[in-house]
């Protein structure tokens, strides 16, 4: 976990205006900067960037956040990747676990080694791209595949010359440690030679565009057809996808991402205008791949050959996706005719028919899930139904998306003819409990007893986000029972007060990332942005804020006193409740 003080320092050294202006040309508009939103199509600028509060907001689509949030959303990076991206820009080293970064010399050495490896793969990619220009056989192969110079350049395709040590033309001495560590050169008991020879080369880039590895394809029928870089300090095939960096703009424009099996499929699809394709790197689609895909788009499509190998790969992808599923994301599976792969299909039928098949003939995960599991099972028999329950049970248990999990279990209930309550018991879950009126008196949530309070609480949260220094005016007694938005307000104030200095709004938002109150904070902050109430408050506003806090405290104390009095009349109070009531009554008098 990255320390919060590091995030604070990183944001303090980062100017969000510079970060966004590199991607979206900004124009000064009053105190803020404006542009057309990069996250949706629009003609009139509604995307605002605040240099003082260091956050962005789109008044049309609602996108908002700090510099970290922008990099995550715009480049499709995870939180740690976005932090690393910004840290590299300002020369900071992201702290690692287990005290790896305690020693400055160790940090510097590690950073130097990382840079050397990155420079090595970049130089190799340039070498391969240059070699392609001078090899007629390689150029003829790509020409036969119908690839234009623009697509070849966009994906950085190249050619690894035949021979044992072509990289000696670039790297001296040969070999060196970096060549071996990046997998470019094989060390076979002291004998060194290039891994990639006489192959079309596909550079593999990380989300920041840096070359981290390669895939190489033969020009003839030699084996292996594809050869990939091994896992290295730069490259992990289970956590990277080919074409993700090159296709990021097309993915955003289409609103979907397409997973295919081979590098050439990705490039061929791009040649025909389908630029949102990616491919796994010599491995099945992993859970990490699914996480990455879901960060890129709401709709994820898998397109595989219709043969047994393709269907096996599709099912592996589905299995690995189950724990990562979300109710606002959808997965679809398209199986092409056995004689086709995506490359040959789009060449034969064109972009329009390919996308029509993708959108209208692909099967949603829910349909493919039951189709695959039911294959070969006789559901007209009791034994078949029992088998389906048994085989689906461990898979259903992995699904954490609540709505989808519920609907899939409802579908299983229909398929096997078992009542949902009884089926839940078979699946190892408790059946839904009947509503029974509780005998024990429970203190009511303050939002129920005082419907005006959530609105007032939200106003205070909004004011605190805009003016973090006002947290000094919030002092909540320990004995108060807090829930809902009031608990959120208390946590927000405590977070700000624990900060060594008064944080900016963007820093506060990042501190709340991953907390139980993140959704509430974002909802209220978004409301403030939409209402354009984001200017800092003056002296009168600060006084009103303090009055509001006092009013909330009084309302909360009164509500809890009344609840305890009612319980005292009904069933009596225990010792802790008596002490609580005494504290509340004493506070009320003061």
Curated annotation (Swiss-Prot):
It catalyses: ssDNA + n NTP = ssDNA/pppN(pN)n-1 hybrid + (n-1) diphosphate. A zinc finger (CHC2-type) spans 37-61. Its cofactor is Zn(2+); Mg(2+). GO terms for biological process: DNA replication, synthesis of primer. Binds 1 zinc ion per monomer. Binds two Mg(2+) per subunit. GO terms for molecular function: DNA binding; DNA-directed RNA polymerase activity; zinc ion binding. Its EC number is 2.7.7.101. Mg(2+) 2 binds at residues 305, 307. Keywords: DNA replication, DNA-binding, DNA-directed RNA polymerase, Magnesium, Metal-binding, Nucleotidyltransferase, Primosome, Transcription, Transferase, Zinc, Zinc-finger. Residues 255-337 form the Toprim domain. CDD domains: TOPRIM_DnaG_primases (cd03364). One of its GO terms (cellular component) is DNA-directed RNA polymerase complex. Mg(2+) 1 binds at residues 261, 305. Monomer. Interacts with DnaB. Contains an N-terminal zinc-binding domain, a central core domain that contains the primase activity, and a C-terminal DnaB-binding domain. RNA polymerase that catalyzes the synthesis of short RNA molecules used as primers for DNA polymerase during DNA replication. Belongs to the DnaG primase family. This is DNA primase. It comes from Neisseria meningitidis serogroup A / serotype 4A (strain DSM 15465 / Z2491). The gene is dnaG.
């Amino acid at each position: 976990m990255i320390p919060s003080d590091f995030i604070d320092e990183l944001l303090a050294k980062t100017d969000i205006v510079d970060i966004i202006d590199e991607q979206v040309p900004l124009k000064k508009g009053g105190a803020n900067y404006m542009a057309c939103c990069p996250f949706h199509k629009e003609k009139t600028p509604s995307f605002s960037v605040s240099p003082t509060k260091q956050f962005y907001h789109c008044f049309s689509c609602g996108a908002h956040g700090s510099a970290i949030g922008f990099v995550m959303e715009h480049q499709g990076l995870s939180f740690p990747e976005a932090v690393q991206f910004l840290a590299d820009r300002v020369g900071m080293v992201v702290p690692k676990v287990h005290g790896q970064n305690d020693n400055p010399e160790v940090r510097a050495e590690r950073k130097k080694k990382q840079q050397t490896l990155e420079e090595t793969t970049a130089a190799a990619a340039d070498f391969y791209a240059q070699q392609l220009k001078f090899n007629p056989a390689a150029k003829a192969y790509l020409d036969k595949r119908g690839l234009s110079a623009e697509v070849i350049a966009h994906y950085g395709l190249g050619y690894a010359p035949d021979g044992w040590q072509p990289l000696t033309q670039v790297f001296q001495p040969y070999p060196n440690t970096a060549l071996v560590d990046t997998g470019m050169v094989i060390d076979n008991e002291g004998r060194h030679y290039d891994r990639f020879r006489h192959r079309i080369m596909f550079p593999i880039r990380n989300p920041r565009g840096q070359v981290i590895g390669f895939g190489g394809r033969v020009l003839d029928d030699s084996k292996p057809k594809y050869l990939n870089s091994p896992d290295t300090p730069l490259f992990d095939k289970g956590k990277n996808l080919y074409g993700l960096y090159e296709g990021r703009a097309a993915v955003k424009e289409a609103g979907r991402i397409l997973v295919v099996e081979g590098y050439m499929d990705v490039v061929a699809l791009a040649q025909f205008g389908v630029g949102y394709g990616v491919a796994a790197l010599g491995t099945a689609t992993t859970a990490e791949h699914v996480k990455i895909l879901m960060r890129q788009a709401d709709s994820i499509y898998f397109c595989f050959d219709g043969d047994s190998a393709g269907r096996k790969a599709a099912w592996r992808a589905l299995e690995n996706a189950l724990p990562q599923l979300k109710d606002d994301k959808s997965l679809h599976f398209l199986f092409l005719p056995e004689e086709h792969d995506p490359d040959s299909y789009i060449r034969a039928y064109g972009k329009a028919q390919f996308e029509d098949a993708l959108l209208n003939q692909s099967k949603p995960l829910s349909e493919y899930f039951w189709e695959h599991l039911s294959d070969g099972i006789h559901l007209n028999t009791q034994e078949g139904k029992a088998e389906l329950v048994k085989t689906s049970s461990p898979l259903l248990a992995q699904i954490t998306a609540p709505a989808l999990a519920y609907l899939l279990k409802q579908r299983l209930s229909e398929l096997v003819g078992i009542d949902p309550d009884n089926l839940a018991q078979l699946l190892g879950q408790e059946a839904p409990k009947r509503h029974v009126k509780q005998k024990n008196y429970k203190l009511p949530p303050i939002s129920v007893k005082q419907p005006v309070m959530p609105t007032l609480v939200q106003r205070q949260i909004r004011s605190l986000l805009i003016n973090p220094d006002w947290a000094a005016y919030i002092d909540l007694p320990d004995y108060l029972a807090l829930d809902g938005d009031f608990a959120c307000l208390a946590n927000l104030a405590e977070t700000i007060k624990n900060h060594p200095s008064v944080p900016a709004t963007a820093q506060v938002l990042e501190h709340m990332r991953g907390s139980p109150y993140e959704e509430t904070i974002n909802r209220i902050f978004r409301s403030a942005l939409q209402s354009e109430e984001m200017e800092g408050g003056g002296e009168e506003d600060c006084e009103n804020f303090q009055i509001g806090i006092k009013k909330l405290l009084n309302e909360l104390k009164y509500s809890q006193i009344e609840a305890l009095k009612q319980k005292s009349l009904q069933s009596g109070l225990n010792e802790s409740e008596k002490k609580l009531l005494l504290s509340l009554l004493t506070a009320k008098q003061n």
